[in-house]
A protein has these predicted regions:
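Predominantly the structural core of cysteine protease catalytic domains
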Residues: 114, 139-265, 270-276
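A short, polar/charged loop/turn motif at coil->beta-strand junctions and beta-hairpin connectors
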Residues: 80-84, 127, 210
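Alpha-helix initiation and N-capping motif
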Residues: 4-5, 85, 126-130, 147-148, ...
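Bacterial Sec-dependent N-terminal signal peptides
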Residues: 1-28
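Acidic helix-start/capping segments at beta-turn-to-alpha-helix junctions
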Residues: 124-139, 170-173
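Acidic/histidine-rich, surface-exposed loop or edge segments in extracytoplasmic proteins
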Residues: 86-97, 130-137, 184
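Processing junctions and N-termini across compartments
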Residues: 11-12, 98, 166
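Structured alpha-helical subdomains that flank or immediately precede key functional sites
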Residues: 18-102, 106-110, 116-121, 142-151, ...
């Protein structure tokens, strides 16, 4: 059904692309420097374990600045009684992987965000299809897509169930037929907006406590997902090398003041991070 809640997007860094899951076990070594540069130029990077990540295209490298979208959230009343921790993960569909296609926007929005919204409203787990939006946008290209394109489809058409239009990382060409599109109309969003950026941390915490998940487009480097000194897969901005970055869409589903961190759900499978 159409959600009366508005989807809010916190776009940390403008991008038209996204990363794919790690697919091999190569290792960063000094002797392979020339190969690494070639891989980076083609849109890849590796984590400390040698897992290779692919991106769907170019992004605004070197800019960690927040970029506000066309429609901005206004007049949000920031809660003065925010809990120390809050987590919407219980409403998520099963953690899954986008595979080797640049479909992170559709995974974050169509699969995680919209499935979560419907699950909160209906009281049971719903599994919607990232392929419904991704295939319509990519049209067989299988590269990265913009957040706004995905959100516009959810606003205009909705999104179908996984059963009606299953996802395969070997197919970004097949298009939903009219029957599938008709079923998708039950799962629309009413609107989406950007955060103002003026008090973003508390804006995000307030929205999460109102059961409103937040889309982000994040600038990442090789440190993303690496365990920190506490054993957590936390991402510390001060450690980011903005000369070697990639861009990726994810969904913010919680926060923890004890760790001074927000919790995101990713589309690289349960092996990544803290079980996904």
């Amino acid at each position: 059904m159409v959600r009366k809640l508005i989807l809010f997007t916190a776009v940390i860094s403008f991008f038209q692309a996204c990363n794919d899951e790690p697919v091999d076990n190569s290792v960063f070594v000094e002797e392979q420097e020339e190969q690494e540069i070639e891989e980076w130029d083609s849109g890849t990077f590796k984590d400390k374990d040698g897992n290779l990540f692919f991106t769907g295209g170019d992004c605004d490298q070197g800019s960690p600045d927040y970029i506000v979208g066309e429609f901005v959230l206004e007049d949000l009343q920031i809660s003065t009684t925010l809990p120390i921790q809050f987590d919407l993960s219980e409403f998520l569909p099963p953690i899954d992987s986008q595979g080797t296609m640049g479909s992170c926007s559709s995974w974050a929005i169509s699969y995680y965000m919209k499935s979560m919204q419907e699950g909160i409203e209906d009281g049971f787990t719903t599994r919607l299809s990232p392929a419904y939006t991704y295939n319509q946008i990519s049209q067989g290209f299988c590269g990265g897509t913009a957040l706004e394109e995905t959100l516009d489809i959810l606003k205009e058409q909705g999104v179908s169930s996984w059963i009606d239009f299953p996802y395969s990382d070997a197919d970004c060409t097949t298009q939903p037929n009219e029957t599938v599109k008709e079923s998708a109309s039950d799962n629309k969003i009413s609107d989406y907006k950007s955060l103002s950026g003026e008090n973003m941390v508390n804006e995000m915490k307030t929205l999460l406590t109102q059961q409103i998940p937040i889309m982000i487009g994040a600038t990442l480097s090789e440190q993303f997902g690496r365990p920190d000194s506490f054993g957590d897969a936390a991402y510390r901005e001060h450690a980011v090398n903005y000369e070697r970055t990639a861009c990726h869409a994810m969904l913010v589903v919680g926060y923890d003041n004890l760790h001074n961190a927000f919790k995101v759900v990713n589309s690289w499978g349960v092996e990544w991070g803290n079980a996904g």
